[in-house]
Amino acid sequence: MGTYGEFTDIAALQDCHNPFDAFALHKAALIACGIIPAEGGSLNSITDRIGGLYLSTQMHNVPKGSGLGTSSILAGACVKALFKYFGLPCTEPDLYNHAMCMEQIMSTGGGWQDQVGGMTEGIKYITSAPGNRQILSVRHISVPEPALRELQERFALIYTGQRRLARNLLRDVVGRYLGNNPDSLYALEEIQRMAAMMVFELERGNIDGFAELLNKHWELSKMIDAGSTNTCIDQIFAAIEDLLDGKMICGAGGGGFLQVILKKNVTKEMLRERLHETFEDCGVDVWNCTLV
């Protein structure tokens, strides 16, 4: 973004509730990691103790509002950098919890799924027990090597050309849940079951079965929040329906990226050509991606 700022007033550093502030994430990292208090205090006394601090972040080629969890991943990177700077050990739970705390401080909402998904390698099945303190269980899925290669070949990311802010969508989802909306409660229960079934199909090496479940997950997501899709997303999926075995949004939806499983013998170049023919000069495109 090429944005630079200097802060000599602690109140300005503590003001991190605007997610459009270029430095909101950096400020939240300082508060979440206990470098500065959430309110009050003296910046001079803090800098005298730690000798000042220069915090620089870079993120290349990923648009804002992508749905790929980049803000949570960048939050985790800030946490890890601060822990290392002060010579403190940093476990994976430390990363997850501090990143989630930062999101609450910035008022963007969210949970732990983005940081766990983005900062831990591999395909994972992530669960937590009920309660205010979220203790996570991260299980790495063992996918047979031939199936993993097939998934890499058939999996594609499509950018919609639209930006969305997850905070607004998440508030709608939480509101429907707290209001005991029957469709939302049913869909949330089914999504948990769907995730376990996806693990089963991946461990069997059944990519077609996984793709079918991805489609069901997409229908359930729309039951939870109609804002997860829009005219643009519907048109993109309609234009490439004959090329796909599975489709789903990334993140909260409403823009950002879409994830798809291509039919066998359909290449990403064929997908790209179809999108370019249908959507000219509007940012809709296939992005290169690799499973790690």
Which residues does each predicted region cover?
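C-terminal nucleotide
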Residues: M1-R49, K84-T91, N97-G109, Q115-I249, ...
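Glycine/charged-rich beta-loop-alpha catalytic/anionic-binding loops adjacent to active sites
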Residues: F7-Q14, L53-K64
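Short linear Ser/Thr-Pro motifs
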Residues: D9, M59, T70-S72, S221
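Short pre-catalytic strand/loop immediately N-terminal to key active-site residues, enriched for Gly-Thr
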Residues: V62-S66, L244-K247
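DPxDG-like acidic metal-binding loop motif
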Residues: S66-L88
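Short glycine/threonine-rich catalytic loop with a Thr-x-Gly-x-Asp
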Residues: L68-T70, K247-A252
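Conserved glycine-rich beta-strand-loop-beta hairpin in the small C-terminal domain of fold type I
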Residues: G256
